[in-house]
Each structure stands twice: as C-alpha cells, then as structure tokens.
Amino acid sequence: MPVPKKKTSKARSRRRYAVWLGKAKLQAQRAMTIGRAILSGRNTGFYYPKAKSEEDEEE
C-alpha cells in the first residue's frame, strides 16, 4: 500500500483547501442563479413535463 513519504506543507494544504472552497462557492452561485431564473420565469433552457390535471386523467 503506497504511503506518502513527506508531510504536506501548510501552504500546500491551505492552497488546496482554497481551491476546493472556490469550486464550492462557484457551484452554489450557479445553483442560486438557476433557482432565481426558475422562480422568476426567466428560464428558457429547461424542460418540465406538465403535471397531469384531473381533466387529463379522466380521458
């Protein structure tokens, strides 16, 4: 089983953590933007199957 030979430096660890946090923030921002677009009705690139109403079920 491979084992790291040296301890990872604090600078490298913090840099990796900062990159990870940046990616997480970007994903959160995208999710909020998409959510806002859906709620405000500005979404054009999404496909939603229409909910079946009671009239459609009777046919």
UniProtKB/Swiss-Prot annotation:
Keywords: Ribonucleoprotein, Ribosomal protein. InterPro entries: Ribosomal_bL32. GO terms for molecular function: structural constituent of ribosome. Disulfide bonds: none annotated. Coiled coil: none annotated. One of its GO terms (biological process) is translation. One of its GO terms (cellular component) is large ribosomal subunit. Belongs to the bacterial ribosomal protein bL32 family. HAMAP family: Ribosomal_bL32. This is Large ribosomal subunit protein bL32.
